[in-house]
A protein has these predicted regions:
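Single conserved hydrophobic/aromatic residue that forms the stacking wall/gate
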Residues: 1-17
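Charged, compositionally biased boundary regions
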Residues: 13-14, 19-258, 262-287
Length: 287
């Protein structure tokens, strides 16, 4: 076990080293009786490392109190009950910043990725749209798919939803083509990562059976780049459930398991996306 001072001597980030004050929060199991000894030693170590202690809180048996506050009305010895997570001020602040609440368990996460209710209009539209295939019209169909993706993102950015069922159907059918799928993957930008995260998740949940794997695999990469590694794996579960032989999903599963930095996707886009655009639009697409 390292003291706070020994930790301080390690490779702290510049943000931590530049901190003016410290907040110490100690979560104590019900069965522990000598926590005050550890907390006192840790507090003294922080002070000696030039991290002034602004507040020290203990949390035990779903109650909390301050070790610094001397007001018995504010911080009685028995502590105050913890607020409900959904009602806490920090929860409201995070939601206002666009950050979703964490999932309570793996089942909640899985359910958040499941398909929405069946949309019969989309399924009907899908039957009218031919796949790209290798034909004289393949290039035109790929262009149609890429342009539909651009329109979809614009709609989603404006309204948080896409109401054009024909457009959604075109995307889902065209993304069975590898070039259109790669265009969707390469269109993501770090500056608009949250937009693509929300849009591709929504599109995946709209997709009927046999059309999930391409969009789910693309969405898994966005999850990974966003730092949502567990979600990325669960999204791949959906992709492989839809198509057990989907090659890119298997490749991403192996890649995610290596724990490599998410930034690698930005590097890949920078190198590959211009080539994909050129292949689809013959260099005519201006981005």
């Amino acid at each position: 076990q390292k003291t706070a001072y020994e930790i301080y001597q390690c490779d702290w980030s510049s943000d931590v080293c530049s901190s003016d004050l410290t907040l110490l929060v100690s979560y104590i199991p019900d069965s522990v009786s000598d926590a005050d000894v550890v907390i006192k030693a840790l507090s003294e170590s922080l002070e000696s490392a030039n991290f002034p202690l602004r507040e020290s809180l203990i949390v035990v048996a779903n109650r909390w109190r301050s070790l610094i506050c001397a007001d018995a009305l504010c911080c009685p010895m028995e502590g105050q009950p913890l607020p409900a997570f959904e009602q806490a001020r920090v929860t409201a602040e995070q939601i206002s910043l666009g950050n979703p609440l964490p999932y309570r368990n793996a089942e909640d996460l899985r359910q958040s990725l499941e398909r929405f209710d069946v949309d019969e209009e989309i399924e009907s539209e899908i039957t009218t749209i031919p796949e790209v295939a290798d034909s004289e019209t393949a290039q035109k169909r790929r262009q149609e798919g890429a342009e539909a993706l651009i329109d979809f993102i614009n709609d989603f950015e404006s309204d948080g939803i896409c109401r054009d069922k024909k457009l959604i159907a075109i995307i889902l059918v065209r993304m069975k083509d590898l070039q259109v799928r790669d265009f969707a993957l390469g269109s993501v930008t770090h500056e608009r990562l949250n937009l693509y995260f929300d849009a591709y998740k929504w599109l995946m949940r709209m997709a009927p059976q046999n059309y999930v794997a391409p969009i789910a695999t693309v969405f898994s990469a966005v999850c990974y780049e966003k730092g949502e590694g567990v979600m990325a794996q669960r999204v791949l579960d959906r992709a492989l459930s839809d198509d057990p032989d989907y090659a890119l999903a298997h490749l991403f599963r192996q890649f995610f398991a290596t724990g490599r930095k998410p930034e690698i996707f930005a590097d890949m886009r920078k190198e590959l996306h211009p080539k994909v655009c050129d292949a689809i639009f013959s260099g005519t697409l201006q981005r």
